[in-house]
Amino acid sequence: MSETAKKVIVGMSGGVDSSVSAWLLQQQGYQVEGLFMKNWEEDDGEEYCTAAADLADAQAVCDKLGIELHTVNFAAEYWDNVFELFLAEYKAGRTPNPDILCNKEIKFKAFLEFAAEDLGADYIATGHYVRRADVDGKSRLLRGLDSNKDQSYFLYTLSHEQIAQSLFPVGELEKPQVRKIAEDLGLVTAKKKDSTGICFIGERKFREFLGRYLPAQPGKIITVDGDEIGEHQGLMYHTLGQRKGLGIGGTKEGTEEPWYVVDKDVENNILIVAQGHEHPRLMSVGLIAQQLHWVDREPFTGTMRCTVKTRYRQTDIPCTVKALDDDRIEVIFDEPVAAVTPGQSAVFYNGEVCLGGGIIEQRLPLPV
């Protein structure tokens, strides 16, 4: 290998995407090393086992590829910069997205700094399904080639500088191709299922987990007409548009259409429900977003036409965006949208390019 080979540290999660990313970078002539991050300390045996198994898988892959694996503990950073904010949002009756925060504070901040400063890396790499393109001297974030797996929604907080220091090898591939490469190489992660659940906390029973940190406060479930029809176990367990877990059946009029959460009255600890997933109370004509992050880091002024996603895997919604001030925008959808949820992120696109996004501060309800 030449003296000039650039050094890349791959965030090895013990999953198939980061495993194949490491191999692809080797094929491209980079000097590759891996880094396994431990970001969660609190816990019961179950989570410890998951983390231990993931580390063992990451180590097995690195051994197979002949690369060094470093480990680092970012549990304090995760607790301070991700988890405490996550709890505060739930406490305020909003529904945060911890994966977005984790990418912002851990993977593309703590990891990026550690790789550059402690390990002498030129770049970091992750197994995210996104692409980068350098245009006019700035790195842009593009959707992953596999539209079914595209993860740009979770990376909208990244700046062009962070993207310039990051490589996303699987972003150019479809997921089945990634699995096929792993199988052909005989990697232990080839058939490992994709992780779901909260970022580094893994797949645990969410209600039970949240209950450890936030005391649940039961309260009334009320219909949009003001009838009390049940009791909820805590507003934090419910999100707009939710149907499951309400514990209420049909109505006295006999209609069997399912109930959906349409609003939360945090002040009075009341959950408001209506029947039908397209109930007018569930629809929004737009939203106000704050805590904005634009990938090019240029302040947004005036108005623009683009598309928006108000949750992961949603079909793009055509919209008009208008700057209200330095850190707030108003977004008006071309057509009403269901279940726009405060606390979640609104992420904007111009074709393949992810422009950035912000946190949904409030939804603009359909006038009824």
Curated annotation (Swiss-Prot):
Protein name per UniProt: tRNA-specific 2-thiouridylase MnmA
Pfam families with a match to the protein in the record: tRNA_Me_trans, tRNA_Me_trans_C, tRNA_Me_trans_M
Reaction(s) the record says it catalyses: S-sulfanyl-L-cysteinyl-[protein] + uridine(34) in tRNA + AH2 + ATP = 2-thiouridine(34) in tRNA + L-cysteinyl-[protein] + A + AMP + diphosphate + H(+)
Record keyword RNA-binding present: yes
Stretch list, region Interaction with tRNA: 149-151, 311-312
Location in or out of the cell: Cytoplasm
Highest taxon in the source lineage: Bacteria
Enzyme kind, highest EC tier: transferase
Gene Ontology annotations of biological process type: tRNA wobble position uridine thiolation
Residue positions binding ATP: G11, M12, S13, G14, G15, V16, D17, S18, M37, G127
Major site of localization recorded for this protein: cytoplasm
Classification lineage: Bacteria, Pseudomonadati, Pseudomonadota, Gammaproteobacteria, Enterobacterales
UniProt region (Interaction with target base in tRNA), positions on chain: 97-99
